[in-house]
A protein has these predicted regions:
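Conserved glycine-rich beta-strand-loop-beta hairpin in the small C-terminal domain of fold type I
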Residues: 263, 280-290, 302-315
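N-terminal small-domain helix-loop-helix segment of the aminotransferase-like
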Residues: 1-85, 92, 267, 335, ...
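Conserved PLP-binding active-site segment of the aspartate aminotransferase-like
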Residues: 234, 313-319, 336-374
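Conserved core segment of the aminotransferase class I/II
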Residues: 206-280
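Short amphipathic alpha-helices in soluble, non-transmembrane regions
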Residues: 325-330, 368-372
Length: 380
């Protein structure tokens, strides 16, 4: 598989809406400095020794309290495990529970870099349809029967790239179908807490006592991605299998220092207010992007107004290949992520993903204006 180039929003000549990363205004640097100073002032030899493989109580206990309060559903530390973020968690799950040649059910469209993680483990991708928060359960059932998948990978909340959230009925169907078939349900919940109405959905792992659900969370989108701190929520049986991986047993806590820093912020009760600030900033940017899209692409594209997360999924109404158009668009100083990159079969060629996280409202206004002008010229 060809490696996708890592991009940042630091090119002064390009407003790159392909970049799904926070800008500096979304990273609470003062809170991180204060937490770092606190950790430094209270540093002990235990802080920099091998940590518990599942993570230290100083991280897991306040994390459980934060998750319980934010989602209004009880979460206990015993069902949590420290990770280096959702990508590293997904890699761990593949290592622990799959073998080369196994099938993985994935949404179409889905997070394109997850494809590379699955490929690293020699897994076969089997796409199933997702649209406007719904799934075709009959078709999915047939795929499960035919392919006997080891995993089903979903991004239920404010999907990357679609931006939608699965309905309660769709989530219940996924949980039920995976339980009956013995398929592990892997729920990537990186955007779960970025609801613009400040009402976070409960994790999929919190909705069932079934042993087949793993929810993956991260502080990359709600604090800072460079910390590389996240968690897996699952039952004790699955957690023990993950903790039994050789490199976990050998190295102990996956990110001891980072987890203590985040734990300090959680323990001080600061994460809730930091999250609220992030939600408010993102909502303002999403609103401006929606308004600018209406003004500049309203006659040539369709999309849904975002209600959370990082992304807007835009589909051109005329036959056009957004992959082929991208180099021409970038020459004019604006970029996007082509829709086909989010499909294991190359579908969604008329669509594109736009991120409103990496730029302020002025840049978003400027970039969407430029995007609309350029696309109208190219496709007409």
């Amino acid at each position: 598989m060809t490696r996708v180039a890592f991009e940042r929003a630091d090119d002064p000549n390009l407003i790159n809406f392909a970049v799904g990363q926070p800008d500096q205004a979304l990273i609470p640097i003062d809170a991180l400095k204060q937490a770092s100073a606190h950790i430094g002032a209270t540093l002990s030899s235990a802080s920099v020794n091998y940590g518990l493989p599942q993570g230290e109580p100083q991280f897991l206990e306040p994390l459980a309290q934060f998750l319980s309060a934010t989602c209004h559903h009880p979460v206990v530390a015993e069902e949590l495990m420290l990770t280096g973020g959702t990508s590293q968690a997904l890699d761990m799950i593949c290592q622990a529970f799959t073998s080369p040649g196994d099938a993985v059910l994935i949404e179409d469209a889905s997070y394109f870099l997850a494809f590379q993680i699955f490929a690293d483990h020699g897994l076969k991708l089997v796409p199933f349809s997702r649209s406007a928060g719904t799934i075709d359960t009959q078709a999915l059932g047939q795929l499960i029967e035919t392919h006997q998948p080891k995993l089903l990978y979903t991004i239920p909340f404010f999907s990357n790239p679609l931006g939608d959230t699965l309905s309660t009925q769709a989530i219940e169907s996924l949980i039920s179908m995976c339980s009956k078939s013995g398929t592990l349900l892997v729920s990537d919940e990186a955007y779960q807490y970025l609801a613009f109405d400040h009402q976070a959905e409960s994790s999929l792992a919190s909705r069932t006592a079934d042993s087949k659900v793993l929810s993956l969370g991260t502080f990359s989108k709600i604090l800072a991605p460079g910390l590389r701190v996240g968690w897996i929520q699952c039952n004790a049986v699955l957690r023990e299998r993950l903790l039994d991986l050789g490199w976990v047993n050998s190295g102990g806590a996956i990110n001891q220092w980072g987890s203590l820093l985040v734990g300090s912020i959680l323990e001080a009760g600061r994460q809730a207010s930091l999250l609220e600030t992030t939600q408010t900033l993102l909502e303002a940017r999403a609103r401006v992007m929606h308004e600018c899209l209406t003004q500049h692409l309203g006659t040539i594209a369709t999309w849904d107004a975002p209600r959370g997360g990082y992304f807007v999924w835009v589909t051109l109404t005329e036959a056009a290949d957004t992959t082929a158009l991208l180099p021409l668009v970038r020459e004019q100083g604006v970029g996007y992520q082509p829709g086909a990159s989010f499909s294991s079969t190359g579908a969604h060629g008329q669509s594109m993903r736009l991120s409103f996280a990496a730029y302020d409202t002025n840049k978003i206004d400027q970039g969407i204006n430029l995007l609309g002008t350029t696309l109208k010229r190219l496709i007409h």
